[in-house]
Amino acid sequence: MDRFELRRLDYSLSDDHVALQNAYRQFFKTHCSIETVRAAEPSGFDKSLWERLCAMGATTMALPESCGGDGATLVDLTLVAEEIGRSLAPVPWIDHVCAARLLGRLGALDADTAGLANGEQLAALDARIDCVRGARLIPTGSIADHIIVRDGDQVVRLAFGTRPAKVDNIGRLPMAWVDPAAADSRTVIAEGSDALANYQRALDEWRLLTAAALVGLVEETMTIAAEFAKTRYTLGVPISTLQAISHPLANMAIAVQGGRNLARRAAWFLDNEPDERPELAPSAFVFMAEEAAKAATMAVHIQGGLGVSAEAAATAYLVRARGWPLAGGDPGATALRVAEIVAARENAPQPA
């Protein structure tokens, strides 16, 4: 892909991008069936799937070459995230790579965290926009070896001798309450404005990749609903020909394409011109957080009584469409951040 294509609103993928996405799509199709997803729900994590994913290089690709990684771009990472969402893969890849990339930027990938690059150790971060003190819900807190949080103007790495207990959550994530004061190990890895700016970058990347995952989720739930509608008849015609079915499906397709384009554009700017359009990554997240819930709900409605059964794949997609965005706190806080960025830019003094 030409370096400036996404800046020019050309969202086509190169042959390498297509090959990358196809490789991960085939991987999850082979190793992550809906039965695998269901089996992992008690813990929110499939260790075997994670090890297979790491063996493909999914964690090392996200790190720069200076940190022993493969130097993948954020556009590359959105393609992997999309396939994770499509398959509902019970792996903490998004949280892990965002935390590992943050540690890399802060020069904190040391001997204690040597296992992060290849996924032997797991990293988590507090994905909330607002900085809170005391205990907070961490999306992958029950399985992480290292938990990265803000504490005032410090970025700290926490470790627990006994991992925090998983709490039930609608997104079926390995979520846990984490109190920095209760950690067995607390290491300050950076402090000051630069440290907080780098943490904000990690939050933007988390929202970007979560948005991309929701794109894949919506596309798959749309496919499930469409296949159902093509095989069910009423009055001698497939229900897919009825406007009450076909129009919502078309709206899902529009949401998928719009969210995908927005995520890829946000990824390009975050990589190449991060100060030019900082609102794009949180905008992609806010858009997909809303659209994913609406699309997954409609997919359940299209399937009627079958769709609301606990065994239906559509139900698995619905709860995650609603739950995954909440892992970063109230999506409204992200919408407020978008508004603040745009307002600050519009109200900035213009050069004479």
Language-model-derived ranges and their functions:
Residues 1-87, 109, 201-352:
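Alpha-helical interface subdomain recognition
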Residues 79, 83, 98-105:
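Generic beta-strand or strand-like secondary-structure segments
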